[in-house]
Amino acid sequence: MLLAAGEGKRLGTPKALVELGGRRLVDRGADLLRDGGTAPVVVVTGAAPVTVPDVVLVPNPDWRTGMGSSLAAGLQALPGDCAAAVIALVDQPLIGAGVVRRLVAAHHAGAELVVAAYHGRARNPVLLARRHWAGVIAAADGDTGARPYLRAHPGLVTLVECADIGSPDDVDTPEDLARVAALLAG
């Protein structure tokens, strides 16, 4: 699931629509999940109408309240046969499909709450096994997303180191966008 509902105040435009290397961040994020082996790919939208091929679009009418409402909307829209959900953010274009594959592999090995780590620091994306969705939805508030639930269940969280294959750098400002574009250009 890709959370892509925000308006991007500091960036001056909805992040989902921002182009990086000739591609919108929302398309990059959908490809990240698809190439990482997740299906269906759900994109939660809000501030800007977005069309993305081959995804399930979930509009969040409460997007102004923050990431928590988008997370809840997306989890509630997933089909009943989904055993887990990988949650990624639209503004982290340096996370590659290999990160998603590592989270999925940890889940297949028995982990239920899987968090990508970069140099030991927990960041996004995260994988949430279905049995935790109701608790995550209940705890999600404002821009905290799944963080309160994960902090309340530290013994169930599996950190998966991903610094060798990705970076959680956010695109929040025009300066961030320029820096990330330079990194992608090599």
Model-derived regions, located:
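Conserved nucleotide-sugar donor-binding
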Residues: 82, 123-135, 174
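Nucleotide and nucleotide-moiety/phosphate-recognizing core
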Residues: 1-122, 155-162
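Nucleotide phosphate-binding site architecture
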Residues: 8, 18, 133-134, 178
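A residue-level structural signature of the nucleotidyltransferase/glycosyltransferase Rossmann-like core
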Residues: 92, 124-127, 138, 168-169
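Short, well-ordered alpha-helical scaffold segment located
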Residues: 94, 99, 132-135, 176
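Short beta-strand and adjoining strand-loop segment in the mid-core
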Residues: 72-74, 133-136
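Conserved alpha/beta core of the MobA/IspD/sugar-nucleotide pyrophosphorylase nucleotidyltransferase superfamily
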Residues: 138-186
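A short acidic, helix-capping loop that chelates divalent metal ions and anchors anionic groups
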Residues: 9-13, 136, 167-168
